Design a protein with these regions (language model features):
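Ankyrin repeat structural motif
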Residues: 48-56, 81-89, 113-122, 147-156, ...
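Bacterial signal peptide processing site
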Residues: 29-31
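Leucine-rich solenoid repeat scaffolds
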Residues: 194, 200-227
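C-terminal motif of bacterial Sec signal peptides marking the signal peptidase cleavage site
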Residues: 25-27
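Ankyrin-repeat inter-repeat connecting loop/turn
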Residues: 62, 95, 128, 161-162, ...
Length: 227
C-alpha cells in the first residue's frame, strides 16, 4: 500500500496538495456544514420548494419541528404547497406525527380542503384514523367547512370511518348540518355522505338526528335529502 506521504505525479506535477495530505493524515476530510435548526421548518412553512430541496440535500431532517411540535410537512400542508409536501414525504417525513394541538399533515387537510396536497400526503401512507384535539378525523372538519372535493376524495380514496363520533358527539353528517350554512356546498356534502352510507340515525348527545337539526334550522334542501 502506498504511504500517505506519496504524491500522485502526472506529467511530473505534484497533484496532492499539502492541505489534502494533512486531511488524509489526520483522518478529518472536510464535512458538510450542519444545517441550522429551524431553517427547514421555515422554508416548508413558506412553501419554498427550492429552499426545502437544498436543505434536504444538505442533510436537514425531514421531520424537523417548531416550538409547538408542528412538523415541517404539516406546515407545508397549511402553506398549500403540494411540491414541498412531495419533497418532504419522499425524504421520509412522518405524516402521522402530531403537534401539541394534535394536528398532523393528514388531519390538517380537513381544515385546508386542498385535494392537490392530499395527493402528496397519501404517498406517505397516513393513518386516517388518527384524531385531532376535538376527537375528530379529517372528514369531520372537511364536512363542516364545506370542502366538497375534499369530502369526496376522502370518501373515495381512503378508508376513513364515515360514522366516527368526535368528542362533541357529532359525526361528519351531524357537523355538516349543525355547523354548515345549509347552502349548496353543505347540501352537496350531505348528499355525498348519504350516498356513501353515512348512518342518518346517529344523533348527537341529546339524541337529535341530522334530519331533526336540519328541520330546526330551516334547511329545507337538506331536509329533503335526509328525509
Amino acid at each position: 500500500m502506498r504511504s500517505v506521504t506519496q504524491a500522485v505525479r502526472i506529467g511530473g506535477s505534484v497533484c496532492l496538495t499539502a492541505a489534502f495530505l494533512l486531511a488524509v493524515m489526520t483522518g478529518c476530510a472536510d464535512e458538510p456544514e450542519a444545517v441550522p435548526s429551524g431553517e427547514l421548518f421555515e422554508a416548508a412553512a413558506a412553501g419554498d420548494v427550492t429552499g426545502v430541496r437544498s436543505l434536504l440535500d444538505r442533510g436537514a431532517s425531514p421531520d424537523e419541528r417548531d416550538g409547538s411540535g408542528r412538523t415541517a410537512v404539516t406546515a407545508a400542508v397549511y402553506a398549500g404547497s403540494a411540491e414541498t409536501v412531495r419533497l418532504l414525504v419522499a425524504a421520509g417525513a412522518d405524516v402521522d406525527a402530531q403537534d401539541d394541538m394534535r394536528s398532523n399533515a393528514f388531519l390538517a387537510l380537513g381544515e385546508t380542503g386542498d385535494v392537490a396536497v392530499l395527493d402528496e400526503v397519501l404517498r406517505g401512507n397516513p393513518d386516517v384514523g388518527l384524531t385531532n384535539r376535538f376527537g375528530g378525523t379529517a372528514l369531520i372538519p372537511a364536512a363542516d367547512r364545506g370542502h366538497v372535493e375534499m369530502v369526496r376524495a376522502l370518501l373515495d380514496r381512503t378508508t376513513i370511518d364515515i360514522d366516527h363520533v368526535n368528542n362533541l358527539g357529532w359525526t361528519a353528517l351531524l357537523e355538516a348540518v349543525i355547523l354548515g350554512d345549509g347552502g349548496p356546498a353543505h347540501q352537496q356534502i350531505v348528499r355525498l355522505l348519504v350516498a356513501a352510507g353515512a348512518d342518518r340515525s346517529i344523533g348527537d348527545n341529546a339524541g337529535m338526528t341530522p334530519l331533526q337539526h336540519a328541520q330546526a334550522m330551516g334547511f329545507t334542501e337538506i331536509v329533503s335529502i335526509l328525509d
